[in-house]
């Protein structure tokens, strides 16, 4: 998204909007790794944190968001603010004609998401949200198998993405503040199964969910599941949690003539084109470039 944002421009200048998110440092590293992108400025809702980060990155710090967005040496922004603040900062960035890369999730309500989309379209800026697993080999393998028809009619998907952040206490305390984060495990980790399901199965039609809290501070959900029915009648069971010390990564995609199953790093499949039953693919699709590129 960043490289080549401005046609003919040799260097794209980036404004980092907050270090709140746990992946903010990773995104800064990705920007710095690009030969044609540079972090020129940092803004943060926590001025002390932002000032320290700007010094670490060798960039300017601007405590006023409007002034930061008005800088001539800013072409695009990377949004890592609290989720609850996404709408405000993204709308300002769009109106300032800055291209936008944002951490997921986009916003905390559908109305806010639609307002953001409208502002992006009206202001003609480029936009990308971080859905990293779309670039992973598993997603590309499944997409190819569906497109080729080698699984038959796909009718079921199950995906689990979980970790033990609440169970073992390694997430920052503010991660459990619903007023900042917008929710708990499903809002954070659960979005990965959600967008993969949409990528593979199409448009969702109805959803039923169960969220509960076992140990996470603040009462946010740390153990959750959603069952989604799609327009093509496929059903997806999408699981997540902050208490998943074992079995954090599981995936199943089932069709009338084949299936793809992955547990951890172990993957096997069977298709209508292979008569020998289950097999392990010799080669998976290549990992695609990250969205920030």
Model segments located where?
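N-terminal Rossmann-like dinucleotide-binding module
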Residues: 2-56
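C-terminal glycine/acidic-rich active-site capping loop/insertion
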Residues: 132, 252-293
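Hydrophobic residues in well-ordered beta-strands that form the structural core
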Residues: 16, 63, 101-102, 127-129, ...
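Contiguous beta-strand/loop segments that form the cofactor/metal-binding neighborhood of enzyme cores
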Residues: 195-268
